[in-house]
C-alpha cells in the first residue's frame, strides 16, 4: 500500500493507538457503521505478506487462504500489492510491518519486546495482523480464521466451517496479549494400538521420502504437521512427541525441521534427557550397554552429546536429569516403575553428578553457558522423593512438578512438612520458573486409563487453578494419550494456560464449555450439548471404565441401578440431540459426544448385567440367564459402537478406538476385550420362593453445597464448584493460597432423640499433601462440642497411595470420625473447620447405625426448610436430567 494514503486517514490512525482490547469478536457478518468489508460476492482477496517473513507465518497464511475459501467462497492469494485487503507480518522479519510502525500507523509499543503477541487492527479499508514474533503472527492469523468460523478442531474433529457470504471487520485494535504460561503443550503418549494404527494407515511412510520406513510407521512430518497446526490454532507452542515405539528426531529428520519452521518448541518426556528419545537407546541397547550412569557414563555422555548437537539450533526445551531404563525408577527394570527401592544418599550424589555433567555437555555443544539454554527437570514419581530430601538444580533450570497420574497435584512450590498459613509467590520465585505435568491418560497401576475421557471438567479446572495460584506458570503440559478422544480437555487446558486469570471464578469453566459447544455444534444447540459434555465427564470421573467391576457400586440398595439409569438417560438425550442437529454437525457430534456417551452407557449396562447375573445365580433366580443374555448383547454392542466410530467421515478415524478396555485383571491392558464371565442356571437349579426383603435407615447424607451456614476467612471465601465430584458439586475455600483461620461451614440435620453417638463421614477430593507433606487437616465437631482434628491425607505417600483408599484414581478420600457429645435435641449441627488450604468438600454422611458403604455415599436425604411457605424444597436435591 502507499504509506501516504494510510497516513492521511487520521481518524483510523488515532483509533489504533487506543489501548488494545482483548481479542473479543472483531469480525461481523453484517455491515455496521465503521466496519471494513473483507470478503463479499465471491471476490478474490489478496493478502500482502513479505516473502522473507518466518516460514511458519507463510504456512499459516496459506492455511488462512484455504479457510477463507471454505467460509466465504472467496479465493485468496499471496501478493505484494500495497492495496491488499489484508496485511500480515512479524515485527522482527517484515519490512512492511516495520514501515507501518515507523510511520506510527501501528503502535510499536504493543509489540516490541513482547512474546507471542499479536495485534489485529483496521486502517482505512484494510485489516492488519502484526505479530511480535513468528508465533505471535501465527496466532493472529489463526484468530482471524477462528472468528471467521473455522474451529481449531475443524480437521481433528470434523467441526464444520460456518458459511458466510459477507464478512466485515470492526474498527479498532484487538489482541489477546501475551501468554501467561510460557510453554503450553501436550504429550502424545501410550499411543499403541490406537494412534499408532491410525497414523500407519493415514500417513504411510511411502508418501514421506524423508521418513525411515522401517522405523517411523506413520509418525513422520506429514502427521506431525497436522498436530503442529492444531497446537498453533489453540495458541499452544510445546510438544512431547509419541515415543513408545518411535524416535521423533531419528525416524524422520524432517520432523524437527518442520516443528521449528512452524514454531513448535519440542521437548522430551521425564525419562528422555538431553533431547534423545528412549527408542534411540533401546534399539541399540545391546551395543550401548546398561542405562546406568554409575557404570556406563562414557557411552551415555556420548549419547547426550549427540542429542544436544542435533537440537542446538532449534528452540527445544532440554530435559535434564535421568530416570531408569524405559520409564522405570533409577536401578529398576525396564518399564517397572513400581519396583522402586530407595538408596537416598547414593542416588542424590549420582543425580548431582548427572546435572553437572549434562550442563557441561550443553555448554560444550552450544558454545554458550548452560544457563543460556532453557532446561527442564521433571519431579516425576520417585524423583519427588529426592527433591523432598533436598536435591536441587541450578536456579535457571525450570522445575516441572507433576500430578499423581490421576489428576491430583502432588506438590507445589514452597511445600514443607508443616505447610504454610498463606502463600507468598515471592518466596518461591526462581529464574527457571515452575511447571506442571498433568494427565488425562495414564498407563500404570492400579489400571491403565487409555480408552475414554474420564477427567471431570470441574476437576481439571480446580487442579490447574491450584497450580497457577501457587506460582506454577512457566510450563503446563498435558498427557493426552492418543489425542482423541481428549479434544475437550486439551482445549480447556490450553485455554487456561494462555490466561488463567480469565478462569478465576468457579463457574468460568462452564462458560468455556458453552463456548466450545457453540463453536462445534452451533449456537442453537450449545446449551444442550454443553450439558451433555458436562454430565458425561462428571459421570465418567466416578470410576474409570478399566476399573469398573460388579462390586464398584452398591447393588443391593439400588445405587448401581441409579448410575446405570443416569447413563441411559444421558444416552437418550444424546441420541435425541444427534437426530435434531444439522447434518453437517453430526460427524463432530458423533466423535465429541455421541460415542463417548453411548460407549460408556453400554459399558455400565454390561457390568451391571454381570453383577445381576452373579447375584441371581448365587440366589438361584431364573433371571440369571436373562442377565447373561444382556452381557452377550452389550459385549457385542461395544464392538458395534467402535465400528461406528471408525466409519465416521468415510473411515477417517479408523483404529482410533482400537483400545481394549473390557476384561482387565491386572494394571496392564488385556490383549483383546474379554467378555465378562457369567453363569447360567439349569431348570433344576432355579430356586422356588423363600426370598426376604428389608429396608434400612439410619443415616443422613448431605451434599456439601447444602450447608446451613458458613463463615469465610479474612482473605478466602467458600465457593461452590458445580458438577465437581461424584454426584452434585463441592465447596472449597478459595483462593487456596490464603490463610484458613476463621473459616468454617455448618451442616444442620435431624436425628432420633435416642441417638447417643454418630460416625461422621467427611468425603473430600483426593487432594494429596502437596503443601503440608505431613498431611492436610480439618477439625470436626457436633453441637458445639470439642473439635476433633483429622489428618485426611497424611498417609497418601508414593509408597502406599493405592493402599490408603480404594484407588487414588477414584479421586475420593473418606474419613470417619466418631462423635458422642450430642445435644439432647432433635436438630443437630456438624461444624467442619479447615486447618490447611486445599480442602475440597464433596459430601457428608452422618451415620447413626444404618449406613452401609456406597460408592456415591447415599442418595441425599430429604431437605427440610425452616420456612416452607417461603421456599418449598423439592424432595430430590439434584434432578440432574432436568438441569
Please place each PLM-identified region on the residue numbering.
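Bacterial Sec-dependent N-terminal signal peptides
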Residues: 1-25
